Design a protein with these regions (language model features):
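DNA-contacting interfaces and partner/effector-binding or oligomerization modules
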Residues: 111-165
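Polyanion-binding surface elements
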Residues: 209-231
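Broad phosphate/nucleotide-binding scaffolds in NTP-utilizing and phosphate-metabolizing enzymes
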Residues: 1-117
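Short, solvent-exposed cationic patches
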Residues: 33-49, 161-181
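A short, Lys/Arg-enriched interface patch at domain edges and termini
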Residues: 189-205, 258-265
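Short helix-start
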Residues: 244-265
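Residue-level detection of the helix-turn-helix DNA-binding "recognition helix"
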Residues: 239-240
Length: 265
């Protein structure tokens, strides 16, 4: 993951933090809570008005795209050759230009550490999510909070019915990049902060954990299928501590699905 500070050159104000997950080509922008509709980047003002400071990945990527040379530019091949690029890459162009464009005074600067406000906010990100019966989500968060949430109760989530009314879409649900959402069909993102804010700390029962084991613990073969890799690749990741088994067996290890997915980020 690469981390960039978004800074206003005129005021020197830290305007946001851009997280770029290179393996998936996914961007997430975190905004400081001191921003208002006048100091926030124009594209994000509607979110700031609603007190939403974690920008969805599609809107974050749109911010990147708006600041770089479009892929349809007539001389794009010459530009790619000039920068020794084999293919069009929005983030590469953003780094080359330092994120500067004519529409505002913002620029980006690569940093090594996440600011405290981002670290604190990420404690509400999702680690594991179990798709239980009756469209109920069992969500495990970074700060050890566990919530059991019925999709029908998320009235503020506009795309709720697209998930509820299509069982195939519902069953496709998984933890999204960085734990920022539960994503369905890779096209509908249910934000982690929205799930965390639900008043639903319902006591768990044994069946909840049985469902968890059934759906979220993978053996070596299932993990290889999910990552589309060989057993040798799996062994390499374990040796390099990129992946930690929850149980080691001679015939094959067991892994948490969330840990396996994180190797793709």
């Amino acid at each position: 993951m690469k981390i960039f500070a978004i800074i206003d050159e005129e005021t020197t104000l830290l305007t946001g933090i851009l997280l770029y997950y290179e393996k998936e080509g996914t961007c997430v922008i975190e905004l400081p809570e001191y921003l208002d509709e006048w100091t926030a980047p124009l594209l994000f003002t509607s979110y700031v008005k609603k007190k939403i400071y974690t920008i969805p990945r599609d809107i974050s990527f749109l911010w990147v795209k708006e600041r770089v040379i479009p892929s349809g530019r007539q001389n794009i091949n010459d530009i790619l050759a000039h920068h020794n690029m084999q293919s069009y890459d929005e983030m590469k162009f953003l780094e080359i230009s330092e994120g500067k464009c004519s529409q505002d005074s913002l620029y980006i600067k690569k940093i090594d550490m996440l600011p405290d406000f981002v670290i604190e906010r990420q404690k509400k990100n999702i680690v594991e999510c179990v798709l239980s019966d009756d469209h109920t989500l069992l969500c495990f968060f970074e700060d050890d909070t566990i919530k059991k949430i019925q999709l029908e109760d998320l009235q503020s989530f506009e795309e709720q019915n697209k998930i509820i009314n299509n069982e195939q879409v519902y069953q496709s649900g998984k933890v999204g990049t960085g734990g920022y959402c539960v994503t369905f069909n890779e096209s509908i993102d249910l934000p982690a902060w929205l799930l965390y804010d639900e008043e639903s700390n319902i006591p768990l029962n044994l069946n909840d954990f049985k469902v968890f084991l059934k759906k979220n613990v993978l053996d070596t073969t299932e993990s290889c299928d999910l990552l589309e890799c060989s057993r040798q690749n799996m062994s390499y990741m374990v040796r390099k501590q990129q992946l930690t088994p929850v149980k080691e067996e001679v015939r094959g290890n067991l892994y948490l699905k969330g840990d396996v997915l994180r190797t793709l980020w």
